[in-house]
Amino acid sequence: MTAVNENNVVWQNRFKLILLWMIPFGLMILASVIYNLVQSGQISVASKNQGYLIQPPVQLSKLALTSSKEADNIWHGKWTMVIRGGEDCDQGCLDTLLLSRQIHIRLNKEANRTQRLYLSDAAALSPSLSEHLAAEHHYLTVAYSDSPSLAPLDQAVLATAEARQSEAKFILVDPEGWAMMVYSAEHDGAAVLKDLKYLLKYSAER
């Protein structure tokens, strides 16, 4: 082998070593760039869910609640559609309650694995709202917690909705009490139903 060929082989080997050394750093830089683009909203990561993911999710199972449902943990074993409200419920709130009832009915045999909950920061509902819920929403659970306790949930929901330039309509909570997704006026019943059917299909029945 000539001296020129030997030098070529040496440089080729060095080049391969340099490439092997650079690959991990290149991947780290690429991952960092992609992460920053996703976080800034410049690119999106495709997913099956229709709702807006709450990141990170908010744990509600330890939330001190006064509830119309007699249970140690009202979240356990069921996917819950949460309508956040107060002493009164405006027309938008009433429409959301109606939508949640329609979705619940359309789940058919899977309806027993889901529930609806009106989560209020008022210790008592107005007489008109109480009468309306009693007449129109027999299977709705009503729960109360004070505003400071609900603040982490409210802040997470607001941030999630505002990031999409939307207004939150209701929240989906998993069977372990994690607030997972937010739905806004952009989501119709079909979108919510699609998410719920997918989640019920791939989650264990309790």
Regions found by a protein language model. Name each.
Residues 81-83, 116-119, 172:
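Structural beta-sheet core signal
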Residues 115-117, 124, 128-167:
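Short, internal strand/loop/helix patches
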Residues 165-206:
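Thiol-/selenol-based redox modules, centered on thioredoxin-like
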Residues 55-76, 83:
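A glycine-rich, hydrophobic loop/mini-helix early in the fold
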Residues 73-101:
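Short active-site neighborhood of thiol/selenol oxidoreductases, capturing the structured segment around
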Residues 98-117:
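Conserved helix-turn-beta segment immediately C-terminal to the redox Cys motif
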Residues 1-62:
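N-terminal targeting signals for export/organelle localization
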Residues 76-78, 111-113, 165-167:
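Extracytoplasmic
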